[in-house]
Swiss-Prot record:
Binding site for substrate: T49, C50, N51, R52, S109, E114, D115, Q116, Q120
Family annotation (CDD domains): NAD_bind_Glutamyl_tRNA_reduct
Organism in which the protein naturally occurs: Alkaliphilus metalliredigens (strain QYMF)
Protein name, UniProt field: Glutamyl-tRNA reductase
EC number: 1.2.1.70
InterPro entries in the record: 4pyrrol_synth_GluRdtase (IPR000343), 4pyrrol_synth_GluRdtase_dimer (IPR015896), 4pyrrol_synth_GluRdtase_N (IPR015895), GluRdtase_dimer_dom_sf (IPR036453), GluRdtase_N_sf (IPR036343), NAD(P)-bd_dom_sf (IPR036291), Shikm_DH/Glu-tRNA_Rdtase (IPR006151)
Leftover remarks: During catalysis, the active site Cys acts as a nucleophile attacking the alpha-carbonyl group of tRNA-bound glutamate with the formation of a thioester intermediate between enzyme and glutamate, and the concomitant release of tRNA(Glu). The thioester intermediate is finally reduced by direct hydride transfer from NADPH, to form the product GSA.
Function: Catalyzes the NADPH-dependent reduction of glutamyl-tRNA(Glu) to glutamate 1-semialdehyde (GSA).
Subunit comment: Homodimer.
Recorded domain comment: Possesses an unusual extended V-shaped dimeric structure with each monomer consisting of three distinct domains arranged along a curved 'spinal' alpha-helix. The N-terminal catalytic domain specifically recognizes the glutamate moiety of the substrate. The second domain is the NADPH-binding domain, and the third C-terminal domain is responsible for dimerization.
One Pfam family per UniProt: Shikimate_DH
Catalytic residues, chain numbering: C50
Family classification: Belongs to the glutamyl-tRNA reductase family.
GO MF term list: glutamyl-tRNA reductase activity; NADP binding
Length: 424
């Protein structure tokens, strides 16, 4: 079995392509069904964010898996045959393991060191568990990668000066409007990215903040705490455009929610407006930027601000990589021993059965012996047997880590006179 990862990220793929291959919730359900049906895929976890669309998997044959996943993406998302050329990535074995650790720490993010990706990885793993698509190999990998990421983030403070996509959007807005004090802002959506944006906006001295969401109940607590916050129903989003200085949109809609044709009918040019779209798929029709008076930004336009404080965070990366390599060595040791564990359990079961049988024979011959004395003998014999097996079992584990566990197991069988198939 081999661990692989296939997909696309912000490093090679444009936002147009990332938008096409984003796994919505409904698409995830369908995708997991297909992944579970495939004879080539034994375990799978889908990681889909605004900057990446990837599948981590356990496969038997990496060459077949690479071709299979390329075809899967092309067919599932109805892409042209050449759509993924030059912009997909594929890692296998240690490289795939290392890649996930880097993703969790934020080394592979648009914003180096950002924290949001760690939560997204945890959610992706939880979803895979819900769909019964993952197993012991990826479960162990994701849990270890998340744990290591938390530790190294604390040790190195790589996230200390990092920004999230949402906070970068607010900073872009602040730069474009030359300050946010006294401004009026509309935030569309109330998911995690929207809430982070709202937290940042409330620190900027804005005059009024409108939150547009399908239900008022979810934002009621914020409204009660902050008098400058007002609720808008989803149907009112266009009506407010002429009364705000800026818009941040971050919904989970699978289609545009702001269209050029509709905005042209409503938007009045008496005041310029900044619109920032941090959703994927995008919320705002890219053609909106053609409307006079409107400045439109999407995720890929935020890279310059994302690189602020980058030098400090890059200094942390070498320390992080060392910690990650140590964690990977530990995981790979566990992974290499997977074929050995059944043999170890079989050896233990064999020795326990043999010990119990011999003790039973002994106690039948010594039926006059007091129960207390029997217990003493049983404890001593079982302890002795356990000690005798300790070194062979440790050697078997070490052999597994070195990659020659099966050969060593066969030697142990022959040397100790066990059945050749006791570990199968």
């Amino acid at each position: 079995m081999k661990i692989i990862v296939f997909g696309i990220t912000h490093k090679k793929a444009t936002i147009d392509l990332r938008e096409k291959v984003a796994f919505s919730q409904s698409k995830k359900q369908e995708a997991y069904s297909l992944l579970k049906e495939s004879p080539f895929i034994h375990e799978a976890v889908i990681l889909s964010t605004c900057n990446r669309s990837e599948v981590f998997a356990v496969v038997q044959d990496t060459s077949i898996a690479r071709r299979w996943f390329k075809r899967f993406y092309t067919d599932f998302f109805q892409l042209k045959e050449t759509a993924l050329e030059g912009c997909n990535h594929f890692e296998k074995g240690r490289e795939a393991v290392q890649y996930l650790y880097h993703v969790c720490v934020g080394v592979d993010s648009l914003v180096i060191g950002e924290d949001q990706i760690l939560g997204q990885v945890k959610e992706a793993h939880a979803e895979a568990l819900d769909f019964a698509a993952t197993g012991k190999i990826l479960n162990k990998l994701f849990l270890e990668a998340v744990t290591t990421a938390k530790e190294v983030k604390t040790e190195t403070a790589i996230s200390e000066n990092a920004l999230s996509i949402s906070s970068i959007a607010v900073k872009q807005m602040e730069n474009h409007l030359k300050g946010l004090v006294g401004k009026t802002v509309l935030v569309v959506g109330f998911g995690k990215m929207s809430r982070i944006a709202i937290e940042n906006l409330l620190c900027k001295g804005i005059k009024r903040l409108y939150i547009c969401n399908r239900t008022k109940e979810s934002v009621q607590e914020l409204i009660e705490k902050h008098p400058q916050i007002h609720y808008l129903s989803y149907d009112q989003k266009y009506e407010m455009l002429n009364g705000v200085d800026a818009v941040i949109s971050a919904t989970g809609a699978p289609h545009f929610i702001f269209y050029k044709e509709d905005m042209e009918k409503i938007y009045q040019k008496h005041r310029p407006m900044c619109m920032i779209d941090i959703a994927l798929p995008r919320d705002i029709d890219p053609a909106v930027k053609e409307i006079e008076g409107i400045e439109l930004f999407h995720i890929d336009d935020l890279k310059e601000i994302a690189n602020e404080n980058l030098a400090y965070r890059m200094d942390c990366i070498e320390i992080i990589k060392q910690s990650i390599n140590e964690a990977i060595e530990k995981y790979e040791g566990w992974y290499q021993c997977l074929p050995i564990y059944p043999r170890i359990q079989a050896i233990k079961a064999y020795s326990e059965t043999l010990t119990d049988q011999e003790l039973e024979k002994l106690f039948k011959r010594l039926d006059h012996m007091a129960e207390e004395d029997r217990q003493v003998i049983e404890v001593v014999v079982k302890s002795l047997v356990k000690k005798m097996w300790k070194t062979p079992i440790l050697q078997l584990k070490d052999a597994g880590i070195r990659g020659n566990g099966e050969a060593f197991a066969a030697f142990v069988d022959e040397f100790l006179g066990l059945d050749a198939g006791c570990g199968k």
